[in-house]
Amino acid sequence: MSYYGSSYHIINADAKYPGYPPEHIIAEKRRARRRLLHKDGSCNVYFKHIFGEWGSYVVDIFTTLVDTKWRHMFVIFSLSYILSWLIFGSVFWLIAFHHGDLLNDPDITPCVDNVHSFTGAFLFSLETQTTIGYGYRCVTEECSVAVLMVILQSILSCIINTFIIGAALAKMATARKRAQTIRFSYFALIGMRDGKLCLMWRIGDFRPNHVVEGTVRAQLLRYTEDSEGRMTMAFKDLKLVNDQIILVTPVTIVHEIDHESPLYALDRKAVAKDNFEILVTFIYTGDSTGTSHQSRSSYVPREILWGHRFNDVLEVKRKYYKVNCLQFEGSVEVYAPFCSAKQLDWKDQQLHIEKAPPVRESCTSDTKARRRSFSAVAIVSSCENPEETTTSATHEYRETPYQKALLTLNRISVESQM
């Protein structure tokens, strides 16, 4: 097998989780670390003693109703109507009691006809707010306070309907369940890809109406402790090869572990023993509603498999593409060095240095030999015109400097004899 070989064999998968590696190859058992994000995307954060907690929720009541859970929403929805009916029913009963309508005296014109008990007052409040209008109970001109209460209850009923029904519709329009159909692979993988060590995970959309476009982002969260024992969290972005995707079919997100990556100096053992968490988010727009959504997940060291790659899920048919969802979580074990990406780059540099040809020193030795030769060469070269350009391969043959030097020496010897 070559250094970057592609041979692999399928690992023995558990029957409960097809494609998952067996338990004995993941990592040794160790204490589970608290994670910031759960696998379903929910935050593992609890706020205690928030300054102005209830006041901030009441001021922004609409956002509070939209963000609350559906069971709490139904309780608030029911209590808002029931309490308003009870409050105004009590007011109408007090008006009737103060005016003497409960005595059933025919000489007294009641404030509200046919209200002789608290039950009757409650039913009148219910009919007024829901605009049922049975016609049996009605307010008269005898009491202006009763007329004013009917006006206030009508206005309050419109406000309650606006907030409660509007919040329910807004909560339905958010379609948070849409984020649950965007699925992240349970494991993240580290393996060789195009000759480079890469971190990979998979994202898939399993609804018929796919997302229009989406942006993937990943951050590495590292927990550190200072000398005083206080824990700090440091975030660092992971550069992705394909961060802008159209999720028609499952896509494998790739992060190349280069010199800018926080995983650059970590080998297989260091990754298994390190204390970090990789937070991944996917922000996308649905084609049915056109609203923006966000799906989240995270990976801790025990969920990162070294030396694996994902199985192929896409099959090319004659007229269409087939996605095998059973292979979404499947992975196979492939060859990958256990050293870090930093060590791989260092080995590659050493390999290139060893294969580089040695530097030739013929020119240097030739220059030294010429310097030791007779200085007549310098005499000839100094006599040449410095403005002349250097000779090219197309010029005619000229005498070498040594021949010129020999002629010059002969001329000097002849002149000396004369």
UniProtKB/Swiss-Prot annotation:
Outcome recorded upon mutating I132R: In HKTD; when coexpressed with KCNJ10 in Xenopus oocytes, it results in decreased channel expression at the surface and reduced potassium current amplitude compared to the wild-type
Outcome of mutating P250L: In HKTD; when coexpressed with KCNJ10 in Xenopus oocytes, it results in decreased channel expression at the surface and reduced potassium current amplitude compared to the wild-type
Catalytic activity: K(+)(in) = K(+)(out)
Topological domain spans for side Cytoplasmic: 1-67, 172-418
UniProt activity-regulation remark: Channel activity is strongly regulated by variations of cytosolic pH; channels are activated by alkaline and inhibited by acidic pH values. Activated by phosphatidylinositol 4,5 biphosphate (PtdIns(4,5)P2).
Record's keyword terms, sorted: Cell membrane, Deafness, Disease variant, Ion channel, Ion transport, Membrane, Phosphoprotein, Potassium, Potassium transport, Transmembrane, Transmembrane helix, Transport, Voltage-gated channel
Associated disorder: Hypokalemic tubulopathy and deafness: An autosomal recessive disease characterized by renal tubulopathy with hypokalemia, salt wasting, disturbed acid-base homeostasis, and sensorineural deafness.
Description of how the protein assembles with itself and partners: It forms heteromeric channels with Kir4.1/KCNJ10; this interaction is required for KCNJ16 localization to the basolateral membrane in kidney cells. As a heteromer with KCNJ10, may interact with MAGI1; this interaction may facilitate KCNJ10/KCNJ16 potassium channel expression at the basolateral membrane in kidney cells. May form heteromers with Kir2.1/KCNJ2. Can form heteromeric channels with Kir4.2/KCNJ15.
Family per similarity comment: Belongs to the inward rectifier-type potassium channel (TC 1.A.2.1) family. KCNJ16 subfamily.
Name of the protein in question: Inward rectifier potassium channel 16
Organism field: Homo sapiens
Protein's gene: KCNJ16
